[in-house]
């Protein structure tokens, strides 16, 4: 399978601090990856470099057969969709208007069908006329997820499989909608999209992803399938907690933190 996105010795430094250093990461088309790690590990900085929002101060990032920095903003928007960690909308856009912002080079009828499908996918079909500023945090997050789905699907309708980058997409969601989002992302990957998501819930990550990248102090501490990455000695050291890792009935690792820390 071809490489969709690749970081080569990529790093980012600012204000005398190195936030990410020497990251090698090749992601294949259709692959589904979760990035995990403690606060300040460099996860969001790495994702912003992979999206083109930040240009590496060392090394490089490639999208397909070109340097990521060689793409124009329009070209990037046509090839990858990004759900940022923090999205503040102060104006009273309706949910449908927010989702419509994701449509690209598709006709009006096709755009309408994609918007309908995305709103149904995130369970906001009855919210399309609502002012987004009146929604709960979780509802707003689902509306923005619908927007990036429309962007991804619009791109795929014209250029084939794209890239979906998600920065803590479940942070405001209840457990049902966390699982719904994970299932949607998996379907996107099965349809050929490349999906990379930052997740804080380690157990959701082990079920969600076929590959986990563990970040620690700006570097990749581990990279591989959940069964090999989720080792108690590694995860405990990275997060500075005592924990055990068991296998659930499906054979997936399940992380159990100890609650008796002194």
UniProtKB/Swiss-Prot annotation:
User: Where does this protein reside within or beyond the cell?
Assistant: Cell inner membrane
Query: Which membrane topology describes this protein?
Result: Peripheral membrane protein
Name one molecular function that GO assigns to this entry: ATP hydrolysis activity
Q: List the disulfide bonds.
A: none
* ABC transporter domain location: 5-242
Keyword Translocase annotated = yes
The cross-references to SMART domains, in alphabetical order and at most eight, read: AAA (SM00382)
Q: Which CDD domains match?
A: ABC_Iron-Siderophores_B12_Hemin
> What keywords are annotated for this sequence in UniProt?
ATP-binding, Cell inner membrane, Cell membrane, Membrane, Nucleotide-binding, Translocase, Transport
Annotated Gene Ontology cellular components are:
plasma membrane
Top-rank taxon? Bacteria
Cross-referenced InterPro entries? AAA+_ATPase, ABC_transporter-like_ATP-bd, P-loop_NTPase
Give the Enzyme Commission number: 7.6.2.-
Q: Which Pfam families match?
A: ABC_tran (PF00005)
Record's Gene3D superfamilies? P-loop containing nucleotide triphosphate hydrolases
Its annotated function is as follows: Part of the ABC transporter complex HmuTUV involved in hemin import. Responsible for energy coupling to the transport system.
UniProt similarity note: Belongs to the ABC transporter superfamily. Heme (hemin) importer (TC 3.A.1.14.5) family.
Q: Under which name does UniProt file this protein?
A: Hemin import ATP-binding protein HmuV
Q: State the species of origin.
A: Rhodopseudomonas palustris (strain HaA2)
Q: Upper taxonomic classification of the species?
A: Bacteria, Pseudomonadati, Pseudomonadota, Alphaproteobacteria, Hyphomicrobiales
Gene from which the chain derives: hmuV
